[in-house]
Amino acid sequence: MATHGDAPPIGRGRENPLLRSGLPIFFRIESANGLGLALPENRHGQSVRVWARSLTTMQKEAIVVSLGSGAAWRLASDEGPYLDGLDAAPCPLAFMTTGMVSSYMHEILALAEGRDITMRNLVLVQDNFYTMVGSALRGTMTGGALPVALDVRVDTDADDDALRGLVTEAVRASPVDGLLRPRHTSLFTLTANGDECRVGRVASLGR
C-alpha cells in the first residue's frame, strides 16, 4: 500500500473533474424535480434518496434528497494519494462522521428540551478511527472501524449523572446508532446499461 511519503505528486498529469467543473464541492439544489429526480417513498418516517456516479478513479458525485425537508444537495468526495485519489474533496467516511455528530447533537438538544434541561455552549467533539491493511491492487485490502470517541462539553445546571444519562439515551435514540449496533447482511446490486450484473459473493439487493 502506498503511503503519503512514496505517493506521486497529487494530480500530476491526471484529469481532475471536480476542479475542472468549477463548481463548489457542496451546494444546495433549488429543486430535485427540475432534474427529473423523484422523492423517495416515506416508509419509515425519515427517507433519503441518493443518486451517485463515479467521475474518475476515486472521485464521486452525488445528489441527496430528503423527503422530510424536501432539500436537495450536491455532494462530492475524493480520496488522498494513499488510495490513488486527487484529494480534491473530503473522503467518503468524513460524511459518515459529520452525519453521526450532527445526529447526536440533534438528539441531545431534543431530549434536553423534553426534560427541561438548559444547555449552554454545547460542543461535541467526535473522533472516528478507521483501519486499512493490505493492498487494493492485490485484492488483499481489509478495512475496519474502531469504537467512536464522543466528548461532550456543555455549561448546564444538571448534575453529572443526569447529563451522562441524557447523552447516553440521546446517542441510542439516534438513527445512526440503530444502523451501527446490529450486524447487517450486506446487500449489493450492480447494474450496467440497465441490466443487472451477477456479483456472486454477496446477496443481491431486494432478494
For each feature predicted by the language model, list its residue ranges.
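Extended beta-strand/beta-hairpin segments
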Residues: 1-97, 110-207
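Alpha-helical metal-binding/catalytic segments enriched in His/Glu/Asp
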Residues: 103-104
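Conserved phosphate/anionic-ligand binding catalytic regions in large, soluble enzymes, centered on
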Residues: 107
